[in-house]
Structure formats: structure tokens, C-alpha cells
Amino acid sequence: MFFRLRFLVFFVLFRNLCCLLLSGDLFRVYGLGFNLGVMIALQILVGICLSWFFFRCIIPQNWIFTLLIHLEFDLGFIIRSLHIIFTSLLYFLLYIHIIKVIFLCLIFDSSMLVWFFGFLIFIFILIIAFIGYTLPCTSMSYWGLTVFSNILATIPLIGIYICQWIWCSEFINDFTLLKLHSIHIFLPFVLLFLIGAHFFVLHYFLSSDGLLDRFPFYYERFFFFLLYYLRDLFLIINILCFLIYYICIYWFFVFHEESWIIVDTLKTSDKILPEWFFLSFFGFLKSVPDKFMGLFLLFVLCFALFLFILNCILIFIYCRSSLLWMSLSLVLFYYLCVGGFLSLYVVLCFPLWMEIQFWVLLLFCFIVCRLD
């Protein structure tokens, strides 16, 4: 039995990683999924290194945040900066990946299972990133967790119980961080399983063909093992070299000013501004005065991606009116995301130049790698 199971596992890996025939008309943008997988693997590896020292920073002294972790062991601050920058880069690549697959879905048919696992991966990444955002226990993350947990308390019937389960008390304390830390460690391994399922289903249905594959005169095929591995690795190596250089020179650009303030439970922060990849969701929560309606709009935003699964079902039953679902989901997800992102920056007057210079250089790195 063990031999058969081992043979099945190696056969699936060999088929999906080595012997898969893909189109020769795949641009470098198609390698964003591979880059996302590498970034998630690096995030988990760096997070495991940080988790060994998290308890030592939190338990002995109340509300001592992990920005001082560089005093505990060598290279601790560099590892923490890598973990934070990898998160920003992960979301940057993730949003580009979603734009790419929406474009492909507007042109070609897509598999329902591929979209389903991709939707679950997106939701899990959101949950893991928000929990990780609250773990450093800075002034910004503490009040951000307080605001979001109070919003969850507005859910009818079960909201107050969810809030008390998260807090483990009448207020946020050390045990709250320990529980969130355990969840933050457990969920990435579930995410790896979903990524494996997404990877297998994608290669099984071959739902990301090139543009020229729809024409009968184009038959060029290549093995996945050598050509596309080298192209994807070249892109990810350029990105990692750029990030390491940026950390060594401008290591402070990933932190807001409130990230250096120790938590004062009796004083609210002057402004509560999450990371850039949470700005659209934060804008939905704050767009209406009622907390429950803001939470409802947040679920509508996440449900916009789920509409693509309905689109795949409608295509499967040959209902061409599915373009309505695609248009609705595109408007809900991206126009509202960009609107919430820009409105928060305009209202809060946050200085953009620190982050703009990073993303401009990153786009330059993509141009150097040639997206062809």
C-alpha cells in the first residue's frame, strides 16, 4: 500500500513538473503563478524562523513588540524586514496575477475548479496577512485589531461570541496574541495544500493556453521542465536580488511611523492606516457609518471573485450571457479596489513617495526581465 501511494505521488509530481507539454506562446506574465508559489514558500520559511523567537519577545514583558527582535538574535531585524517586504511583493504579484487571469477568462473558457481553488487561496492569504499584521503588537496593529474585532461583534447572534473567542478576555491581551500566533502558523500549511490542488487542477485542464493556441496553424509545444523553469527562475532571481539590495539600503521604507510606537491601551493612535494591500478593504469598512453594512460590503467585494466560478458554470452549460457575470465581477472587484485605495490616500494625505519609488523600481525590474 505504501509503495503504491509513493508511486502515485511521484507520478503526479513527475507529470506536472517535468513531462507537461505547454504552448510555446506563453509570455513571461504566465510565470507569475510560479513566482507567487516561490514567494509563499519563502514567506513560510522566514516565518518559521521568526516564530522561534516570537514567544520570547511577548511573554516575559507585557506588550513588547517584535520590532525589537533584532536585539534578541543576529540578523533578526533583516529577517523581519524580509517577511514584511515579501508580503507586499506577494500582494503585488497576486493582484497582477488576478488581472491576467480575468483577461484570459474574458477571452477563453476556464475551469471551475481552478477558479474555486484560486478563490480559496485568495481568502486564506487575506486572513493570514491580517493576522500577521496584528502580531507585532505596535500601536497601529493593536488598534487595527480592536477596530476589526469590534466590527465582527456586530454580526447578529454569533458576533459577540466570535469577538470574545478572539480576545480570550474582556479586552485584547497576551493570550490573544498567542492564539493568533498559533492560527498564523497553522493556516499557511493549509494554504500549501490549496496551492498544490490549484497547481494540479490547472495543469490537468490546461486552462492557461497561449493566445495563438486558438488558431489552427499554431502547434508549437515545449516541455515544462527546462525552458519555463529557466524563464521563471530568471524573473524570481532578479526580483529577490532587487529586494535584498533595497533592504540593505532603504530598510525603513516598509514601516509606517506608528510602527515604532509601543502600544498604549489608554491612548488611541492619531490615525489608523493599514498596509497598502488592505486599503481597499479598510475603505469598504469605513465607507458607511454602520459597522455591519461596512462588513457586508467587504463580503460583497470578496464575493466578486466568486462570481467568476458562476461564470465558468454558465460557460459549461453553454449560456453565453455569462459575460454579464464577468463584467459585474470586474467592476465590483477592481474599480472599487482602486477607488478605495485612492480615496484613502487622498483623505488621509499619506506620503506616497516612499512606496512609489519602490514600485517604480520593481516595474523597471519587470521591464528588464522582458515580458515577452
Curated annotation (Swiss-Prot):
UniProt cross-references to Pfam families, sorted A to Z: Cytochrom_B_C, Cytochrome_B
Cellular localisation: Mitochondrion inner membrane
Annotated membrane topology: Multi-pass membrane protein
Binding site for heme b b566: H97, H198
More about this protein: Heme 1 (or BL or b562) is low-potential and absorbs at about 562 nm, and heme 2 (or BH or b566) is high-potential and absorbs at about 566 nm.
Main function: Component of the ubiquinol-cytochrome c reductase complex (complex III or cytochrome b-c1 complex) that is part of the mitochondrial respiratory chain. The b-c1 complex mediates electron transfer from ubiquinol to cytochrome c. Contributes to the generation of a proton gradient across the mitochondrial membrane that is then used for ATP synthesis.
Family the UniProt entry places it in: Belongs to the cytochrome b family.
Complex and partners: The main subunits of complex b-c1 are: cytochrome b, cytochrome c1 and the Rieske protein.
Protein name: Cytochrome b
Organism: Trypanoplasma borreli
Lineage summary: Eukaryota, Discoba, Euglenozoa, Kinetoplastea, Metakinetoplastina
